[in-house]
Every structure is written in structure tokens, then in C-alpha cells.
């Protein structure tokens, strides 16, 4: 059954609009199951109690004496409905006084808000509507208007200059209303509203103070600046605007800002934010539906076999006011394409960002054979009542790019060319083929899990998948003027204009829920050039440090204890003089480490950046068995100190063919010695050992033939957390708890010092070795049976 609604049976991307939304049963459920409705819906449907719930924002504005709890007297000629509204208004004012913060000293009380005429005006039904389809001065806008009067005191005929432009008081009030509500009202509408209110409030002292400049304000004794109060500077970001005081409901964003308690009211927003006026490319409406239609049914959402999700509320009224983009949690990782767009911008974003949150109600079984998946997505660029949008008639070559992500990792990308809109609506596709395949796979996985008894695990997995799912849609178009300019200049280039960016977040519904989709506008961050904010920092991968830079790094003080003596090389019970681990530089072993004419044992130590796969391992100077298989006798090619402490050692590309013969110690400046070039053997073991380790070292012949000379393996000196438990064994030494010092005998000067250079010395040593197979392990063709039978040497895992 699953194959009957695979992508080849998918309905076209664009379905006809739903003519009667209210007739659908699932849509009827959405009005009762959802508790988030738009502000205007609650007003128009007479939900007075719903209006009461949205008036907490008045708390910080209307601070005056409590109103007597008796019902307010009204004119007998008023309609009973108006009387009820007046009583509700009095109740709102009492609630405002009980919830308001204690900053009444910052502003005087406004008695006109309690006046009979003003309350009657507020209770009057709103008949005139604006271009956005809402009442011109709804309760929401009226509250913002009253707040704007307080924030922008009278200036007379003077202007407020900002960013090279002059603003009158009515323009500042209109801009303030737009900032706090997202709804535009013009300067003339503000002026007309002031005249209406002034017709019945004239003479009230508090009203006169807010609408007319007082004589004291014009006198020379007053030094208060003329202009909007509490206006933030252009040189500072907008913490109140992006600080999270906007919430899901329409009016919580007007609640008092916590840092501004006492005598400071909420701060005003600057004209510097990029909420600039948009008239031609503003999105006014949005519609989205996703459903499955049966084979014999019309492929329409209102006759669907199953509805995955549908739009909640009115398509022209989002459920919440505009919210700053920075309030969306982890938006840079959730929507990577938007993050790249914002980083490439040189100025403010020139299009609107819409956040859509869709809850999907999945099916428990496959649909009937021949079913079709339908997706309808409409974006309206014109206010209600308008049949033509100027921006759409001037734009063509519409495109839509869709990016789908899981935990920020892209799952799908598709580019589509859209038909030129014939109305005010644009209908971008939403990858119905991808969704059909996804729903089929999820249904299959769910049924398989139920058969195996893992129903709960499958449900949790699906829910987690949808929580991690996100999508970005970028809609672009080319204006006719831009195309003509581009063609005339001879540089076609990309002259398309970004029209909208849609951000999608998903989740799976609970068992008793219906799938709903909500939308709201997002406010992009201010321009970096204006707000002086740097771009987000990105990670930088640094190259590995070389061995030289690590060794030259100065050691922090008091990291190591004072040098303490203990035997690193045990000489048959003979005590050895102590050699400090970190002697002063002038006491270093010049015979071994001097830069000129010395025998440098560090020539074979490569730098840290030389990787293991790129170099041939170098055997130890004491390697007497070069012919042994590397997989049996090789040692780790690098030893690194633990990251938990100071860096002491970092040696790469060193292979030890016989770890029981590797006598290593830490010398001055943290050098790890000794090591030699590949294939070097020692003929006169006594002389070489005496020259390197002093007299009394065990002869090479005894080491090669005697098993008892090694005795039981003694734990080696290892560096914690780098070698692990499978460490190799050094020459015998007495165990000591400290790794900060080592003992070494004082040996006589090397007989070869000063007589010849390192190369001549090496040639002399190698040239003096005979190819005698009876050399007890020193010859190249000699095989030691004793070594083959013992387990003294094991490869480090």
C-alpha cells in the first residue's frame, strides 16, 4: 500500500485555495484545542474576557489612585452593551493599578484615562479599518498610542534630528507605534487621532500636558532637551529590544522591562534599527495546509482523508507580534543558510523573515491505494481587500530555493522556478515528493517497531527526529528596472532581489492534538556598520606545534621538585653518582649535545609535524636484531606527554626493535636520548657502552646470549596516559615514585671527542664491524635462538 502514494502519485504542488475553512471538522477543532489566537480575533468576536487578559501591559503606564469598586455610573441613554463595556473598562483599570510597578514618581497620573468620555470612546465599536484589515485604532494600537504620547513630549513646531533627518512629533509617535506593535500608522493618521481625542479631552490638565507644549518648557530656565525621552544612542545596541521581553502573546511585549524600575520607564527604540518602512514587499498574509486525499475524493484540503497540519487562526493575522531574530534559540545552527546570508550582508537585510512552526499529526497506517499528498503554501504581499500589489506586477523570474536540515546537516536542497503571480499571492512549492517519501518511511518503521514490541521507542525516535528537523526557503525575483539597468551596463550578473525568507520548525503532535501551523515575523539584527557589532567568530584550526617550539617553551616555576637521586641504570648493585635532571646550561653534557663536533643523538628525532605514515621508522642504536619482523618487535612511533600537565616530551617516528635494549633517559632541556640512524650496530660493545653509559655497563655479548641476565621484566619508565598498560621494558632500574629526576653516572670524556666529526665517527664504528656470524647477535645474518624462545620482548599494542 505504501507504494501507491509515492512521489509519482503526488498531487501538484499548488492546490486551489480553501473556500470555506470553517466547514472542515479538523479546522473546527483547532478553534477549541488551540489557546493562542490573534489579538484582533478576540476583539472582533466579542471576547471581552479575552481582552481583559491582554491589558497587563497597561500596568506600568496608568499609575493613579484606586478606583472605587462601585459600578461606574453611565448615561441612561446608553445601550446595555455599552454599559457592560464601560463596567469592563473600569475593571481593567482596577487591575492595572494592582499590577503596575512602583514608578509613579516618574510620571504624573493621567486623569483623562478615567474620564467618562474617554471610557465611552474606548467602548465604542471600531468601524473604520486600515489597509491591513484591522481597526485603525484598535485597543492594541490605542494603548501604544498612549504610551507614545508619554515617550515623545510636545515639541511645538520644532523637529527632532537624527541620522541626518528631521522628525516631527507625530512622525515619532507613528514610528514608536510601529516599533512596539509592528503595525504602521501614518503621520496624518496620528494627527487625526489626536484631534478626535482632543475634541472631548480638551481642558484636562494631564491631557494638555501631553499634547501641548507648556510655557515653562519654552522658557530659558528649563534645560531639559526637547525631543523623545529615554531614546537610546545610536552607538549602543538595543538590549531592551532584543532582550527577550517579547513573548508569545500580543501584549506581553509591552510589559515593564526589569532593568528600568523606579523612575525610568521602558526605553524607546532608535530610528537606527533596520525596521525601516516597507510598503511594496511586506508580507501581509500566509496560508499553509498539508493533507492526504483519497483516490475518489477531490484533492482539496476541506475534503481530505487525513490532515497533517493546517494554519491556525486568520491567515492575515499572525498569532504573535514580530520577534527579534536573536530570540530564536540556536538559529545560526538550526538554519545554516540564513546564517550564511546574514554573514554575507554588507547592510541590513532587505526582505522579511517569517518563522513558521508546524505540528504534524502522523497517520497510524498507510493511506488507501492511489491516495495523493497535497501541500498548499500561499504568501500574500497585499493587505486584505487589495487585488493588486505593485511589487508583484513589477517583478518576474520568481525562484524558490528550499533547504531541509536535520540537526543543522542538510538533507535536501531544491531550486524551482515559479510561475509569474497573477494575483497578490505567490505559491512556492514545498517539496511534496520529499515529504511523501518521509511519511512512507516513518509509517514503515513504526509498524515494524510495533510488531517487535518497541512501539514506545519508535514513537520517541520519530518525535526526536521532527524536533531536529528544520527548513529554510528563500524566495527571489527580478524587477524590470534592475534587468534593464543590468542589460544596459553590459554586466548581467545576479540582479535578483530577495523577497522573503521562510524559516520552518517542526514537531509531532500529541495523541489528542490536531496539526496546526503558526507564523510570525522576525526582526533581523541591526546593521553591524551602525551598531558596531563584529561578525560571529568562527573556529580556526591551528597547525600542530613542532618539536623545536615545544622544547623551547619555558617551564612554569615550581612544576618539578628539586632534583632527587635514584638509579636509572643499575650496574650490578654498584651505586652510581647522581646526575640532576635539569642542570644549569653551562653544566650540560657537551660531549653528547654540543652543536659543533659533538656526537648528537637527536639527529634521528623528527619534528612533531612529521607524521607516522610518511617516514620510515628508525631503530635504536642498541638494536642487535635488525632482521626481525617489524610487526613483532616494533614500538609506538611517537610518545606524547599527557595534556594534563606541562609538555615535556614529543618524539615521533622512533621504532624500537628490541625494547629491552633501549636505554633512554631525560636529559637537559627535556631532550629524549639516545637514538641513532637506521641499521647501526655495535661491534665493540664494551667500548661503546663505556663511552655512552660509563664503565661497568653490561657487555653486549652477555646481553645477546644470556637469558638469565635480564631476569624478570621490571616495569619501565613510561609517561602516563600515553603508553598505557602495555608498556615496554627498559634496562633495569630501581622504581621511584617521582619522574622529575634521574640518576646518571659521571663518565670520563669520550675518546673520540675533538678528533673527528660525527660522520667520521659513525663511519669508523660501522666500518670496524666484521660480518662474523658468530658474533653472538651482532652480525646481520645471525639469528639468536635464545631470543626466539623468550617472551622478554613484546610489541606494544
UniProtKB/Swiss-Prot annotation:
Compositional bias per record (Polar residues), positions renumbered to this chain: 716-726
A Gene Ontology BP annotation from the UniProt entry: conidiophore development
Cellular component annotations (GO), alphabetically ordered: nucleus; transcription regulator complex
Keywords, comma-separated and alphabetical: Activator, Conidiation, Nucleus, Sporulation, Transcription, Transcription regulation
Pfam families reported in the protein's UniProt record: TEA
Subcellular location: Nucleus
Induction annotation: Highly expressed during conidiation. Expression is positively regulated by hsp90. Expression is decreased by 2',4'-Dihydroxychalcone (2',4'-DHC).
MF terms in GO: DNA-binding transcription factor activity, RNA polymerase II-specific; RNA polymerase II cis-regulatory region sequence-specific DNA binding
Disruption-associated phenotype: Results in the formation of aberrant conidiophores exhibiting reiterated cylinder-like terminal cells lacking spores and causes delayed autolysis and cell death. Reduces significantly expression of the gliotoxin biosynthetic gene cluster including gliM, gliP, gliT, and gliZ.
Disordered, as annotated region: 696-797
Function per UniProt: BrlA, abaA and wetA are pivotal regulators of conidiophore development and conidium maturation. They act individually and together to regulate their own expression and that of numerous other sporulation-specific genes. Binds to the sequence 5'-CATTCY-3', where Y is a pyrimidine, making both major- and minor-groove contacts. Essential for differentiation and functionality of phialides as conidiogenous cells. Regulates autolysis and cell death.
Record family assignment: Belongs to the TEC1 family.
Protein name: Conidiophore development regulator abaA
Species in which this protein is naturally found: Aspergillus fumigatus (strain ATCC MYA-4609 / CBS 101355 / FGSC A1100 / Af293)
